[in-house]
């Protein structure tokens, strides 16, 4: 079995190793077969066959949703919707300050620029997009009858529970609240890609090059990776200028460094 070893390094690399472990857990990868950790805890290895066959894009998005989803705006919106529906169904709906604030929260968060961009990306891949379109045209307000609010909120709840909606809206929060702390200006964080499919951008910029690296013959490669010393081809050289400045001046450095 051919293995690829990953050793600790600076802050960003170590954070990446922790992230990789989260992804492997989500993939239910077999320890000792697909990956492993040395006895002294100073090395993680990956089975090269596993690397080439894994759907890294799906695993990455799945890990982000699973680990950060409960801390995002999406979760807050779902809780507000559930609370409002419960009050109406139990005949305790009395639109006061709390109720008005809940409706405003739902409107504001779901109609934010990032959520609207996310909707545009997936509107042809989901069911009942008209639910979101209706919200854009007519926001939820406390002056609506309880029956109308119940119908609107119930449809909105079902709409948001769709896996594609859940993943897209959670990722919009994760991207700007977590990922953006470490890198920017590349893939789905490149401004010109804001309205493009996030999965497609991640696959093109990260997953596909990662797999190709392990399928490429490096016997004639003249350059070496700055981190592990392994040979890399000219096409595999990756600028790390998109990384945030945490301990290094990334803006001025270009190398075949893999984050």
Give the positions of each predicted feature:
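Conserved small-residue
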Residues: 1-196
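Basic, glycine-/proline-tolerant helical and adjacent loop/strand elements
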Residues: 160-259
